[in-house]
Design a protein with these regions (language model features):
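Nucleotide/phosphate-binding catalytic cleft detector across ATP-hydrolyzing
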Residues: 1-138, 157-172, 192-286
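Short, glycine/acidic-enriched loop or turn micro-motifs at the edges of active sites
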Residues: 123, 145-146
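Phosphate-handling catalytic cores of nucleic-acid transaction enzymes
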Residues: 141
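Short glycine-enriched loops at secondary-structure junctions
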Residues: 144-145, 246
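Short beta-strand scaffold segments in enzyme catalytic cores
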Residues: 148-152
Length: 286
Protein backbone atom coordinates (compact mmCIF):
# COMPACT_ATOMS: atom_id res chain seq x y z
CA UNK A 1 0.00 0.00 0.00
CA UNK A 2 1.09 3.58 -0.64
CA UNK A 3 -0.17 6.75 1.07
CA UNK A 4 1.10 10.24 2.02
CA UNK A 5 3.10 10.28 5.25
CA UNK A 6 1.37 13.22 6.91
CA UNK A 7 0.22 12.59 10.49
CA UNK A 8 -1.76 14.99 12.69
CA UNK A 9 -2.60 14.16 16.30
CA UNK A 10 -5.78 15.16 18.15
CA UNK A 11 -7.03 14.71 21.71
CA UNK A 12 -10.63 14.55 20.51
CA UNK A 13 -12.42 12.54 17.84
CA UNK A 14 -12.18 14.22 14.42
CA UNK A 15 -15.24 14.83 12.24
CA UNK A 16 -14.61 11.64 10.22
CA UNK A 17 -12.94 8.36 11.11
CA UNK A 18 -11.62 7.80 7.60
CA UNK A 19 -7.83 7.31 7.71
CA UNK A 20 -7.90 7.79 11.49
CA UNK A 21 -5.70 5.77 13.86
CA UNK A 22 -6.67 5.54 17.54
CA UNK A 23 -3.73 4.60 19.73
CA UNK A 24 -3.12 5.08 23.44
CA UNK A 25 -5.99 7.52 23.87
CA UNK A 26 -5.18 9.81 20.94
CA UNK A 27 -6.50 10.22 17.41
CA UNK A 28 -4.17 10.52 14.43
CA UNK A 29 -5.37 11.61 11.00
CA UNK A 30 -3.12 10.00 8.41
CA UNK A 31 -2.36 10.85 4.81
CA UNK A 32 -2.72 14.64 5.00
CA UNK A 33 0.43 16.55 4.06
CA UNK A 34 3.84 15.05 4.68
CA UNK A 35 6.41 14.42 7.37
CA UNK A 36 9.07 17.01 8.11
CA UNK A 37 12.64 15.94 7.44
CA UNK A 38 14.24 14.19 10.42
CA UNK A 39 17.77 12.81 10.48
CA UNK A 40 16.76 9.92 12.72
CA UNK A 41 13.35 8.27 12.32
CA UNK A 42 13.45 7.03 15.92
CA UNK A 43 13.45 10.58 17.34
CA UNK A 44 9.64 10.54 17.61
CA UNK A 45 6.76 8.07 17.29
CA UNK A 46 5.54 9.19 13.88
CA UNK A 47 7.09 6.39 11.84
CA UNK A 48 5.90 3.79 14.35
CA UNK A 49 2.35 5.14 14.08
CA UNK A 50 2.57 5.17 10.29
CA UNK A 51 3.75 1.55 10.46
CA UNK A 52 0.59 0.63 12.38
CA UNK A 53 -1.49 2.35 9.69
CA UNK A 54 0.41 0.50 6.96
CA UNK A 55 -0.21 -2.83 8.72
CA UNK A 56 -3.93 -2.08 8.98
CA UNK A 57 -4.14 -1.02 5.32
CA UNK A 58 -2.31 -4.16 4.21
CA UNK A 59 -4.63 -6.37 6.26
CA UNK A 60 -7.65 -4.61 4.71
CA UNK A 61 -6.21 -5.06 1.23
CA UNK A 62 -5.57 -8.78 1.79
CA UNK A 63 -8.87 -9.29 3.66
CA UNK A 64 -6.88 -10.93 6.46
CA UNK A 65 -7.69 -11.34 10.15
CA UNK A 66 -7.31 -8.22 12.29
CA UNK A 67 -5.84 -10.32 15.10
CA UNK A 68 -2.62 -11.71 13.69
CA UNK A 69 1.16 -11.99 13.81
CA UNK A 70 3.35 -10.09 11.35
CA UNK A 71 6.97 -9.88 10.32
CA UNK A 72 8.00 -6.41 9.18
CA UNK A 73 10.38 -6.03 6.24
CA UNK A 74 11.68 -2.46 6.19
CA UNK A 75 14.53 -0.47 4.71
CA UNK A 76 17.17 2.09 5.61
CA UNK A 77 19.57 4.03 3.38
CA UNK A 78 22.78 2.07 2.86
CA UNK A 79 24.83 5.14 3.86
CA UNK A 80 23.46 4.87 7.43
CA UNK A 81 22.40 1.21 7.45
CA UNK A 82 25.02 -0.14 9.85
CA UNK A 83 24.73 2.81 12.21
CA UNK A 84 20.92 2.86 12.47
CA UNK A 85 19.98 -0.79 11.95
CA UNK A 86 19.82 -1.95 15.58
CA UNK A 87 18.13 1.18 16.90
CA UNK A 88 15.46 1.14 14.20
CA UNK A 89 14.77 -2.55 14.77
CA UNK A 90 14.25 -1.92 18.50
CA UNK A 91 12.08 1.12 17.67
CA UNK A 92 9.65 -1.07 15.69
CA UNK A 93 9.95 -4.25 17.77
CA UNK A 94 8.62 -2.91 21.06
CA UNK A 95 8.02 -4.75 24.30
CA UNK A 96 4.31 -3.90 24.19
CA UNK A 97 2.99 -7.03 22.47
CA UNK A 98 0.44 -7.49 21.09
CA UNK A 99 -0.17 -3.93 19.89
CA UNK A 100 -3.83 -2.94 20.12
CA UNK A 101 -5.23 -0.01 18.18
CA UNK A 102 -8.24 1.08 16.17
CA UNK A 103 -8.05 2.09 12.55
CA UNK A 104 -11.16 3.52 10.92
CA UNK A 105 -13.05 2.32 14.04
CA UNK A 106 -11.95 -1.32 13.53
CA UNK A 107 -9.99 -3.01 16.33
CA UNK A 108 -6.61 -4.55 15.46
CA UNK A 109 -4.50 -6.78 17.68
CA UNK A 110 -1.07 -7.22 16.11
CA UNK A 111 1.92 -9.17 17.36
CA UNK A 112 5.10 -8.03 15.62
CA UNK A 113 7.16 -11.23 15.65
CA UNK A 114 10.27 -9.90 13.96
CA UNK A 115 11.72 -6.98 12.01
CA UNK A 116 13.92 -7.64 8.97
CA UNK A 117 15.96 -4.68 7.75
CA UNK A 118 17.37 -4.24 4.26
CA UNK A 119 19.24 -1.50 2.39
CA UNK A 120 16.98 0.74 0.34
CA UNK A 121 17.54 0.78 -3.39
CA UNK A 122 19.65 -2.35 -3.49
CA UNK A 123 16.66 -4.42 -2.39
CA UNK A 124 14.64 -3.15 -5.36
CA UNK A 125 17.25 -4.63 -7.68
CA UNK A 126 16.26 -8.07 -6.36
CA UNK A 127 13.30 -7.66 -8.73
CA UNK A 128 15.52 -6.72 -11.67
CA UNK A 129 18.67 -8.87 -11.71
CA UNK A 130 18.84 -8.26 -15.47
CA UNK A 131 20.10 -4.72 -14.78
CA UNK A 132 23.21 -6.17 -13.11
CA UNK A 133 23.85 -9.05 -15.49
CA UNK A 134 27.16 -8.72 -17.35
CA UNK A 135 27.72 -5.26 -15.86
CA UNK A 136 30.82 -4.97 -13.64
CA UNK A 137 29.62 -1.62 -12.23
CA UNK A 138 26.18 -0.03 -11.95
CA UNK A 139 25.19 3.24 -10.28
CA UNK A 140 21.91 3.36 -8.34
CA UNK A 141 20.22 6.75 -7.88
CA UNK A 142 17.17 6.68 -5.58
CA UNK A 143 15.27 9.99 -5.84
CA UNK A 144 13.07 10.18 -2.76
CA UNK A 145 10.99 12.87 -1.13
CA UNK A 146 13.73 14.44 0.96
CA UNK A 147 16.97 12.93 -0.29
CA UNK A 148 18.68 11.50 -3.35
CA UNK A 149 20.65 8.41 -2.31
CA UNK A 150 23.58 7.23 -4.42
CA UNK A 151 25.29 3.85 -4.41
CA UNK A 152 27.56 2.04 -6.84
CA UNK A 153 27.46 -1.72 -7.16
CA UNK A 154 30.61 -3.52 -8.27
CA UNK A 155 30.10 -7.10 -9.45
CA UNK A 156 26.50 -6.85 -8.13
CA UNK A 157 27.75 -6.05 -4.60
CA UNK A 158 27.09 -2.63 -2.97
CA UNK A 159 30.28 -0.63 -2.51
CA UNK A 160 29.71 1.05 0.86
CA UNK A 161 32.52 3.54 0.25
CA UNK A 162 30.53 5.03 -2.64
CA UNK A 163 27.30 5.71 -0.73
CA UNK A 164 26.16 9.33 -0.67
CA UNK A 165 22.96 11.05 0.45
CA UNK A 166 22.11 14.40 -1.14
CA UNK A 167 19.38 16.66 0.25
CA UNK A 168 17.86 17.19 -3.19
CA UNK A 169 14.63 15.21 -2.89
CA UNK A 170 11.49 15.94 -4.90
CA UNK A 171 9.90 17.88 -2.04
CA UNK A 172 12.56 20.58 -2.33
CA UNK A 173 11.76 20.93 -6.04
CA UNK A 174 8.01 21.12 -5.36
CA UNK A 175 8.36 23.74 -2.61
CA UNK A 176 10.66 25.95 -4.67
CA UNK A 177 8.40 25.60 -7.71
CA UNK A 178 5.25 26.53 -5.76
CA UNK A 179 6.96 29.65 -4.45
CA UNK A 180 8.15 30.69 -7.91
CA UNK A 181 4.69 30.20 -9.41
CA UNK A 182 3.20 32.30 -6.61
CA UNK A 183 5.72 35.11 -7.10
CA UNK A 184 5.34 35.21 -10.89
CA UNK A 185 1.62 34.56 -11.34
CA UNK A 186 -0.02 35.11 -7.96
CA UNK A 187 -1.42 31.55 -8.11
CA UNK A 188 -1.11 29.18 -5.14
CA UNK A 189 -0.88 25.86 -6.96
CA UNK A 190 -1.03 22.68 -4.92
CA UNK A 191 1.64 20.04 -4.46
CA UNK A 192 -0.54 17.54 -6.33
CA UNK A 193 -0.93 19.89 -9.30
CA UNK A 194 2.83 20.43 -9.50
CA UNK A 195 3.50 16.69 -9.38
CA UNK A 196 1.07 16.03 -12.24
CA UNK A 197 2.60 18.72 -14.44
CA UNK A 198 6.14 17.50 -13.67
CA UNK A 199 5.09 14.00 -14.78
CA UNK A 200 3.49 15.49 -17.92
CA UNK A 201 0.05 14.27 -16.86
CA UNK A 202 -3.19 16.13 -17.59
CA UNK A 203 -3.99 19.03 -15.28
CA UNK A 204 -6.02 22.17 -16.01
CA UNK A 205 -3.82 25.16 -15.25
CA UNK A 206 -2.81 28.58 -16.58
CA UNK A 207 -0.17 28.15 -19.28
CA UNK A 208 2.29 30.50 -17.58
CA UNK A 209 2.13 28.45 -14.37
CA UNK A 210 2.58 25.24 -16.36
CA UNK A 211 5.60 26.70 -18.15
CA UNK A 212 7.23 27.71 -14.85
CA UNK A 213 6.66 24.25 -13.36
CA UNK A 214 8.13 22.47 -16.37
CA UNK A 215 11.10 24.82 -16.48
CA UNK A 216 11.77 24.29 -12.77
CA UNK A 217 11.52 20.54 -13.31
CA UNK A 218 14.18 20.71 -16.00
CA UNK A 219 16.48 22.78 -13.76
CA UNK A 220 15.88 20.36 -10.87
CA UNK A 221 16.99 17.40 -12.97
CA UNK A 222 20.07 19.33 -14.07
CA UNK A 223 20.91 19.98 -10.40
CA UNK A 224 20.61 16.28 -9.57
CA UNK A 225 22.82 15.18 -12.46
CA UNK A 226 25.36 17.87 -11.61
CA UNK A 227 25.39 16.85 -7.93
CA UNK A 228 25.88 13.18 -8.87
CA UNK A 229 28.86 14.13 -11.04
CA UNK A 230 30.31 16.32 -8.28
CA UNK A 231 30.04 13.32 -5.94
CA UNK A 232 32.61 11.54 -8.09
CA UNK A 233 30.46 9.45 -10.43
CA UNK A 234 30.83 9.45 -14.21
CA UNK A 235 27.29 9.05 -15.52
CA UNK A 236 28.51 8.29 -19.03
CA UNK A 237 30.87 5.53 -17.94
CA UNK A 238 28.49 3.17 -16.13
CA UNK A 239 24.76 2.36 -16.48
CA UNK A 240 22.63 4.33 -14.02
CA UNK A 241 19.46 2.88 -12.50
CA UNK A 242 17.09 5.68 -11.46
CA UNK A 243 14.31 4.83 -9.02
CA UNK A 244 12.07 6.46 -6.43
CA UNK A 245 9.26 8.96 -6.85
CA UNK A 246 11.49 11.40 -8.71
CA UNK A 247 12.52 8.94 -11.41
CA UNK A 248 9.28 9.59 -13.32
CA UNK A 249 10.21 13.27 -13.52
CA UNK A 250 13.75 12.54 -14.63
CA UNK A 251 12.52 10.17 -17.33
CA UNK A 252 10.60 13.04 -18.95
CA UNK A 253 13.81 15.04 -19.32
CA UNK A 254 16.63 12.52 -19.88
CA UNK A 255 17.00 9.82 -22.52
CA UNK A 256 19.90 7.69 -23.69
CA UNK A 257 19.97 9.77 -26.88
CA UNK A 258 21.01 12.84 -24.87
CA UNK A 259 24.38 11.14 -24.17
CA UNK A 260 24.31 12.60 -20.65
CA UNK A 261 24.11 9.19 -19.03
CA UNK A 262 23.10 5.58 -19.70
CA UNK A 263 19.75 5.54 -17.90
CA UNK A 264 17.55 2.66 -16.75
CA UNK A 265 14.33 3.51 -14.90
CA UNK A 266 12.44 1.72 -12.13
CA UNK A 267 9.28 3.83 -11.86
CA UNK A 268 7.33 1.54 -9.53
CA UNK A 269 7.13 3.42 -6.20
CA UNK A 270 6.57 0.06 -4.48
CA UNK A 271 9.85 -1.38 -5.79
CA UNK A 272 11.72 -1.22 -2.49
CA UNK A 273 8.86 -2.75 -0.48
CA UNK A 274 8.33 -5.48 -3.06
CA UNK A 275 12.06 -6.18 -2.99
CA UNK A 276 12.04 -6.57 0.80
CA UNK A 277 9.12 -8.99 0.53
CA UNK A 278 10.87 -11.00 -2.18
CA UNK A 279 14.05 -11.32 -0.10
CA UNK A 280 12.12 -12.45 3.00
CA UNK A 281 10.30 -15.07 0.92
CA UNK A 282 13.65 -16.34 -0.35
CA UNK A 283 14.95 -16.51 3.23
CA UNK A 284 11.95 -18.60 4.29
CA UNK A 285 12.38 -20.93 1.32
CA UNK A 286 15.88 -21.97 2.36
Amino acid sequence: MCFPTGLTGYDYEPYTMQNVLQYQGKYYVCGTGRQTLVKNKTSNDNYYLLTLVAIAEEIKHRKAERKTEVILAVGLPLSSFGREKQGFREYLLRKEQPVRFLYESELYEITIKDVKLFPQGYSALALHPEYLKNEPSVLLVDIGGWTVDLMRLDNAVPNAATCRSLELGVIRCIDETAEQVRRNTGLSVTETQIERVLRRESCSMAEEARRIIQENGRKYIERILSAVTESGFDLRAVPTVFMGGGSAILKRHVTAQDAICRPVFIEDVHANATGYERIVEQMWAR
